[in-house]
Amino acid sequence: GHVPCGKDGRKCGYHADCCNCCLSGICKPSTSWTGCSTSTVQLTR
């Protein structure tokens, strides 16, 4: 499944695509970046 994420509402299919919507609401390319979490919301492939 895909979920809308970030200010632009981009659809993301993987954690790595868009993190989990960081505090600023901006999609980031890596879940390892500061401010991003993979445990809060589990996106499905």
UniProtKB/Swiss-Prot annotation:
Keywords: D-amino acid, Disulfide bond, Ion channel impairing toxin, Neurotoxin, Secreted, Toxin, Voltage-gated sodium channel impairing toxin
Family the entry assigns: Belongs to the conotoxin I1 superfamily.
Description of its domains: The cysteine framework is XI (C-C-CC-CC-C-C).
An example molecular function term from Gene Ontology annotations: toxin activity
Biological role stated in the UniProt entry: Iota-conotoxins bind to voltage-gated sodium channels (Nav) and act as agonists by shifting the voltage-dependence of activation to more hyperpolarized levels. Produces general excitatory symptoms.
First-listed, main subcellular location of the protein, grouped into a coarse class: secreted
Proregion span(s): 45
InterPro entries membership: Conotoxin-I_CS, Toxin_19
Compartment(s): Secreted
Record keyword Magnesium present: no
Superkingdom: Eukaryota
Name under which the protein is recorded: Iota-conotoxin-like R11.10
Disulfide bonds: 5-19, 12-22, 18-27, 21-36
